[in-house]
């Protein structure tokens, strides 16, 4: 089944991850604060958008984030334009960023309080693993 996925953070790790999701038959839209990263994503046939507002809509079933630090995850999820306030309740949030446990718990609680499913899913395997689609994903979340 093809999912409609919003992917935020298409740097060295996120770009090949999003590309592999596209190759698997999913519909992907991507966003990054770096215009250079968006240009690279576009060259890989990924559909790019210029803002979070253009990315998150009622059609999105999954949001994946791959961000460099907890403060970035916090801003994307909980900030004034945070995606927790924009997604539908049936949307699954997957944070692949390697962030501190406190930030992960804070974001997870905020999502849970709104009835949104979220999993913390940091990865290991580096850029090569992302390119070869061989990353190890360590998943944590509620039993639902």
Which role fits each region the language model picked out?
Residues 1-58, 62-65, 127-130:
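NAD(P)+-binding Rossmann beta1-loop-alpha1 motif at the extreme N-terminus of oxidoreductases
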Residues 5, 99-144:
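Rossmann-fold dinucleotide-binding core
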Residues 20-23, 43-45, 77-81, 107-111, ...:
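Short, glycine/charged-enriched secondary-structure capping and boundary segments
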Residues 31, 66, 97, 139-140:
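Active-site-adjacent beta-strand anchor residues
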Residues 48, 93, 137-139:
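Generic preference for hydrophobic
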Residues 52-121:
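Rossmann-fold NAD(P) dinucleotide-binding segment
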């Amino acid at each position: 089944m093809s999912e409609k996925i919003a992917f935020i953070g298409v740097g060295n790790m996120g770009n090949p991850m999003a590309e592999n999701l596209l190759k698997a038959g999913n519909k992907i839209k991507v966003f990054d604060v770096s215009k250079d990263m968006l240009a690279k994503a576009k060259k890989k046939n990924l559909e790019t958008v210029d803002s979070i507002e253009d990315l998150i809509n009622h059609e999105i079933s999954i949001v994946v984030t791959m961000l460099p630090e907890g403060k970035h995850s916090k801003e994307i999820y909980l900030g004034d334009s945070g995606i927790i306030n924009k997604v539908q309740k049936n949307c699954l949030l997957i944070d692949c960023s390697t962030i501190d446990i406190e930030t992960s718990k804070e974001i997870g609680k905020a999502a849970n309080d709104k009835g949104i499913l979220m999993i913390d899913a940091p990865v290991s395997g580096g850029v090569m693993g992302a390119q070869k689609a061989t990353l190890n994903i360590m998943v944590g979340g509620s039993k639902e």
